[in-house]
């Protein structure tokens, strides 16, 4: 009895699917990834348990990338509890899922809480997500769920500005209506 060997296409397809599933798992677990930081200068203060990075700072955790002028990391029991980044403007991006558009944002000040998956943008903050633009003096962004909360609930004087762009129409729909 002759056994059928799987075709090379089968092996190729299996390889592609396994690579895509590994990539998706990495994006869902950004908070479990180490934080890497590159900068022009770095100092660590053992008394305050903080490290300060200045000059063209790039910090990366999984698919989250932040570019800033200055970054201060606050440690609790040796773990990075809070990262405060500042810049003119500091910028971030995250790839939420494989094949999805990157979510990007900017502000003058940002606070990132890795354990809580929370990014808070302060002072002229903007987030570009899907086809929408969110602008406010305060925006909270959950890096795990991609949920955006803009504005302050305690004040009526500060407004949130949102632009929702319409999705482009499918070309096949246009063809059927023109015939």
Task: List PLM regions with ranges.
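Mature-chain termini and adjacent capping regions
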Residues: 1-179
């Amino acid at each position: 009895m002759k056994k059928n060997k799987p075709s090379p296409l089968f092996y190729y397809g299996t390889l592609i699917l396994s690579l895509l599933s590994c990539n998706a798992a990495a994006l869902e677990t950004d908070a479990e990834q180490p934080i890497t930081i590159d900068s022009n200068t770095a100092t660590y203060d053992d008394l305050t348990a903080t490290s300060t990075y200045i000059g063209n700072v790039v910090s990366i955790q999984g698919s989250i990338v932040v570019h800033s002028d200055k970054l201060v990391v606050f440690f609790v029991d040796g773990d990075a509890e809070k990262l405060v980044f500042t810049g003119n403007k500091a910028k971030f991006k995250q790839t939420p899922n494989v094949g999805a558009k990157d979510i990007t944002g900017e502000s003058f000040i940002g606070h990132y809480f890795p354990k809580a998956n929370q990014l808070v943008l302060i002072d002229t903050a903007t987030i570009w997500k899907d086809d929408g633009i969110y602008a406010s003096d305060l925006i909270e962004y959950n890096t795990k769920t991609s949920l955006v909360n803009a504005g302050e609930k305690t004040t009526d004087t500060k407004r949130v500005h949102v632009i929702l762009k319409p999705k482009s129409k499918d070309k096949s729909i246009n063809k059927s209506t023109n015939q």
